[in-house]
UniProtKB/Swiss-Prot annotation:
<keyword id="KW-0963">Cytoplasm</keyword>
<keyword id="KW-0742">SOS response</keyword>
<keyword id="KW-0547">Nucleotide-binding</keyword>
<comment type="function">
    <text>The RecF protein is involved in DNA metabolism; it is required for DNA replication and normal SOS inducibility. RecF binds preferentially to single-stranded, linear DNA. It also seems to bind ATP.</text>
</comment>
<dbReference type="GO" id="GO:0009432">
    <property type="term" value="P:SOS response"/>
</dbReference>
<dbReference type="InterPro" id="IPR042174">
    <property type="entry name" value="RecF_2"/>
</dbReference>
<dbReference type="GO" id="GO:0006260">
    <property type="term" value="P:DNA replication"/>
</dbReference>
<dbReference type="GO" id="GO:0000731">
    <property type="term" value="P:DNA synthesis involved in DNA repair"/>
</dbReference>
<dbReference type="InterPro" id="IPR003395">
    <property type="entry name" value="RecF/RecN/SMC_N"/>
</dbReference>
<dbReference type="Pfam" id="PF02463">
    <property type="entry name" value="SMC_N"/>
</dbReference>
<dbReference type="GO" id="GO:0003697">
    <property type="term" value="F:single-stranded DNA binding"/>
</dbReference>
<keyword id="KW-0235">DNA replication</keyword>
<keyword id="KW-0234">DNA repair</keyword>
<dbReference type="InterPro" id="IPR027417">
    <property type="entry name" value="P-loop_NTPase"/>
</dbReference>
<keyword id="KW-0067">ATP-binding</keyword>
<dbReference type="GO" id="GO:0006302">
    <property type="term" value="P:double-strand break repair"/>
</dbReference>
<keyword id="KW-0227">DNA damage</keyword>
Length: 365
């Protein structure tokens, strides 16, 4: 799966751009502020309906316009899909796939699975559990079609339950919601656990390449003691939850834990090793997607040279290319990428002041 055409209009500092990317490695280079990261951001926006740099859509729309427009042709083997998105300054989003209006942004994510590696990516290991749950849930969403609705039901019931807790109602008025919460929570947890187990198998081989002297253990925590019946726990913790005004245990508290020996990876590994670990997680997730669905992710890699030394830059690029996925990499100096490859990039683009120009024949300097 790959983008064969990308049209960007009034997106950040790009007034209008038309790209015809290769299905291999696409190198996008230019000075800071030129708009090269905006190209990656536009692809992400097209697949997720939001930016990886800002949740405020108004900031990505050029100030003199009231909307942004993104359009792409997507090759799926012998089939081709067309995806179009408009985001208005009012916040309204209009999405079409093959001419049909789409109401749910989750349909975009299913159609265009995207992996992002940026200088901020390793915050996955330092931020709270929410970002790691989102990482798990990206994979769970793609691996099991029942996950999206089950997790939506969990969130809906939790919202209702928390409101009842704040109103300090009797437990008998909450019991019905607890039964529903248990039912959907067990399904969500099962899908998450199975996904993490499968991801762990993919991750082992990649970590051997990236961190050969380190043994990283990955485990999934469900958000409550696995030896405890969740329904009984909700009843037992009812008074505590009333006092807090929210539900203290459940799948909304799940986490992905990574350790070296008895230490969290944050305490055991260097900053450079942590970056490599996050890259390994993203590659493993993409490989697992391919194994489970026969669909490749599209990889967006921003500012790679500043994050890794030459040896590990070469190793990461080779691992990415071995996935067979379409890759977009940005850099200030194209030589830093070209010199790390055994063969030149499939296609190169130069970006200057929001203007994107294709470089037909990439060569080593």
């Amino acid at each position: 799966m790959s983008l064969t055409r990308l049209h960007i209009e009034t997106f950040r500092n790009i007034s209008s751009a038309q790209l015809h990317p290769s299905d291999g490695l696409n190198l996008i280079y230019g000075q800071n502020g030129s708009g090269k990261t905006s190209v990656l951001e536009a692809i992400y926006f097209l697949g997720m309906g939001r930016s990886f740099r800002s949740h405020l859509s108004q900031r990505v729309i050029q100030h003199q316009d009231d909307k942004l427009t993104l359009f792409a042709n997507l090759s799926l083997g012998e089939q081709e899909s067309k995806i179009g998105l408009r985001r208005f300054r009012s916040g309204e989003t209009e999405v079409k796939i093959n001419g049909d209006k789409i109401k749910r942004l989750s349909t975009l994510a299913e159609t265009l699975p995207i992996q992002v590696i940026t200088p901020e990516s390793f915050s996955l290991l330092f931020e709270g559990p929410k970002s790691r749950r989102q990482f798990i849930d990206w994979g769970a969403f793609h691996s099991d079609k029942s996950f999206h609705s089950a997790w939506a039901n969990v969130k809906r019931i939790l919202k209702q339950r928390n409101q009842l807790l704040k109103n300090q109602v009797s437990y008998s008025q909450i019991q019905f919601w607890d039964k529903e919460l248990v039912r959907y929570s067990e399904l969500v947890t099962l899908i998450r656990k199975e996904y993490v187990d499968s991801l762990n198998e993919q991750l082992k081989g990649i970590i051997v390449e990236f961190l050969p002297q380190v043994e990283v253990k990955v485990s999934f925590t469900r958000g409550w003691d696995s030896k405890t019946d969740f329904g009984q726990l909700l009843e037992t913790q009812y008074l505590r939850d009333v006092a807090a005004g929210n539900t203290g245990s459940g799948p909304h508290k799940a986490d992905l834990r990574l350790r070296v020996g008895t230490l969290p990876v944050q305490d055991a590994l260097s900053r450079g090793q942590l970056k490599l670990l996050v890259c390994a997680l993203r590659i493993a997730q993409g490989k697992l997607l391919k194994q489970q669905t026969d669909k490749n992710s599209i990889y967006l890699v921003d500012d790679l040279p500043s994050e890794l030394d030459a040896k590990h830059r070469q190793l990461l690029l080779q691992q990415l290319m071995d996935t067979g996925a379409q890759i977009f990499v940005t850099a200030i100096d194209p030589a830093a990428i070209v010199d790390s490859l055994t063969t030149p990039p499939s296609k190169m683009f130069h970006v200057e002041q929001g203007c994107v120009t294709v470089i037909d024949k990439p060569t080593r300097e």
